[in-house]
Amino acid sequence: DPAGITTYSVLGADYGYQLLWVLVASMLALIVLHDLAARIGVVTRQGMIGLIRQKYGARSGTLSAGALVLANVGTMTAEFAGIAAAGQLFGLSKYVSVPVAAIAVSFLVLRNSFSTVEKVFFVISAGFIAYIIAGFMAGPDWGAAAKGVLIPTIPFTQEAIFIATATIGTTLAPWGLAFIQSYAVDKRLTKDDLLF
């Protein structure tokens, strides 16, 4: 998630621990909203766009679907920009890394079952453990971090408000809610699958 990594990095680089509470609040909201979206999918057996169409009509459903497509295009653009940047760190041209990645992802998604794709991305996501390890290796000031999490403060500057808003926006992406709700439907989850 290059957009998220960039946003979180700017948040930390520019404000240290001061706005850490924004990240924690965003993650808590992410957990609650994704849980809610999954529950809506379980109970209604419909994805988000289908429910919008049913409740508000075809025009609203079409507009919502269009907005999600635009959001997905933006997200994919950011992902491939991240692939290009990562490739350049290793001396690989973006004109090589991006097409190779696009072909590999397209092949994976279009030529394999959903279950296989899910397993591959689950294994790849294990790489995120490196962020946790790097965080501990950086030797943070745990007292300042706790203060940044527990005592919300924000400098009332345009830059601080912008990065706080960007953090919330990159964490709570609407396409993620639509995906989770549809995922619950596609996996045929039932009320018995819910923990509470």
Language-model-detected regions and their locations in the chain:
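Transmembrane helix-boundary motif of multi-pass solute transporters/channels
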Residues: 1-26, 81-84
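Membrane-water interface regions at transmembrane-helix termini and the short interhelical loops
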Residues: 79-89, 102-124
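Transmembrane alpha-helical segments of multi-pass small-molecule transport proteins
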Residues: 63-66, 89-110, 127, 131
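Select transmembrane alpha-helical segments in multipass membrane proteins
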Residues: 57-70, 156-167, 196
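Hydrophobic, small-residue-rich membrane helices and short re-entrant helix-turn-helix hairpins
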Residues: 7-10, 178-196
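Juxtamembrane transmembrane-helix boundary signature
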Residues: 22-55, 64-70, 74
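Hydrophobic alpha-helical segments and their helix-loop junctions in multi-pass secondary transporters
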Residues: 126-153, 157, 161-182
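Helix-loop-helix connectors at the membrane interface of multi-pass transporters/channels
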Residues: 50-51, 55, 79-98, 185
